Amino acid sequence: MIFSILEHILTHISFSVVSIVMTIYFLTLLVNLDESIGFYYSSDKGIIITFFSITGFLFTRWIFSGHFPLSNLYESLIFLSWAFSIIHMISFFNKKRKKNLNAITAPSAIFIQGFATSGLLNKMPQSAILVPALQSQWLMMHVSMMVLGYGALLCGSLLSIALLVITFRKVGPFFYKKNINRKKFLTEFFSFDVLYYINERNSILLKQNINLSFSRNYYRYQLIEQLDYWSYRIISLGFLFLTIGILSGAVWANETWGSYWNWDPKETWAFITWTIFAIYLHIKTKQNGRGINSAIVASIGFLVIWICYFGVNLLGIGLHSYGSFTSN
């Protein structure tokens, strides 16, 4: 009973803090930077609170259930939100303070955690005894690596999508336009113009004491370079996690089912995901720099990851059907 109450408290704290962080984050884009910079840094620190809340939740559930909390969709979503908070903190503690990355990780964390705590998963939060197939020391290694890989690949893919949007977008950021109606504001607010604005505003702040003028194209190019820089490195990290997860899963499958690979839906889509991002890394290696082709491949990979992550859970078939919607 105590563990259950503590889980609910920690979950609500983390979700509430992330919601407040998102509110503060977007409000700071609508007011003067000098007046809002303190609130912006406070919102970044809120992610740290979220990280420790989710960490406490995972440890509490681990102690209560007696196994690592990655046995169903609810727990894996919370762990995925935890992974996004780690990526967010990497940019927070980075000396250059890459706010472009924060614009991706914070909304992703609140969306995933909001879905995990929604009524759609109301039957999953309760801990249960593991099915025999999951009672293995490989559970922590395999599932944690896969979820961390999903988190990093999703984040890197979103940055690549932002790169494509900003590259092909001809209209300047809406923050500089006056007399914007409410409908248009809401439509463009959730486009990647927010990343454009953050970069240009910060660049102007850094140069405000120097009598130099930079064209908007320079800031646009600088932003594209930053997005490409971070997407490549985050996707590379996610690809490493995914590779380790697939290999450890193959060893686990051989111990449990007597075969390293069975081509069930989850394994098939995991292989497709791995192949797509292997192509991405190959293109990046050949390009030796920024490229649209690699960003397109990463954007396709974004959709494939969600199919791989939720496909089996929606269908409830195959060897990985445990923890799915239908099995609960």
From Swiss-Prot:
Q: Where are the transmembrane segments?
A: 13-33, 46-66, 73-93, 101-121, 146-166, 234-254, 263-283, 295-315
* rRNA processing recorded as keyword: no
* One Gene Ontology cellular component annotation held by this UniProt entry: chloroplast thylakoid membrane
Query: Which molecular-function annotation in GO is an example for this chain?
Result: heme binding
Alphabetical list of InterPro entries matching this protein? Cyt_c_assembly, Cyt_c_biogenesis_CcsA, Cyt_c_biogenesis_CcsA/CcmC
Q: How does it sit in the membrane?
A: Multi-pass membrane protein
Keywords (A to Z) from UniProt? Chloroplast, Cytochrome c-type biogenesis, Membrane, Plastid, Thylakoid, Transmembrane, Transmembrane helix
UniProt function note: Required during biogenesis of c-type cytochromes (cytochrome c6 and cytochrome f) at the step of heme attachment.
What assembly does the database describe for this protein? Answer: May interact with Ccs1.
Describe the family membership recorded for this protein in Swiss-Prot or TrEMBL: Belongs to the CcmF/CycK/Ccl1/NrfE/CcsA family.
Protein name as annotated: Cytochrome c biogenesis protein CcsA
Instruction: Tell me what organism the protein belongs to.
Output: Aethionema grandiflorum
